[in-house]
């Protein structure tokens, strides 16, 4: 079975070699059929600490790296702009 890939936004980089990535999923409401945005947060391994808050990244599913970390950052798609 292929590994899953997701694209999301880095919302926290406070940990060492770990970032929290928020992934948005748009699904229709079961009763009202309106498109609803659901957000899930995943902890992802960032070996070189390259990711910053606001970066758009691609993450790849991996075997468990810790109690809550099951994803690895593949690459940074868009870097956050610093004002």
Curated annotation (Swiss-Prot):
NCBIfam families: PRK05610.1, uS17_bact
Any Gene Ontology biological process: translation
A single cellular component GO annotation: cytosolic small ribosomal subunit
Gene Ontology molecular functions: rRNA binding; structural constituent of ribosome
Keyword RNA-binding attributed: yes
Subunit structure: Part of the 30S ribosomal subunit.
Name used for this protein in its record: Small ribosomal subunit protein uS17
Family: Belongs to the universal ribosomal protein uS17 family.
UniProt cross-references to HAMAP family, sorted A to Z: Ribosomal_uS17_B
UniProt keyword annotations, A-Z: Ribonucleoprotein, Ribosomal protein, RNA-binding, rRNA-binding
Calcium recorded as keyword: no
Pfam families: Ribosomal_S17
InterPro entries named in the record: NA-bd_OB-fold, Ribosomal_uS17, Ribosomal_uS17_bact/chlr
Gene3D superfamilies membership: Nucleic acid-binding proteins
Known role: One of the primary rRNA binding proteins, it binds specifically to the 5'-end of 16S ribosomal RNA.
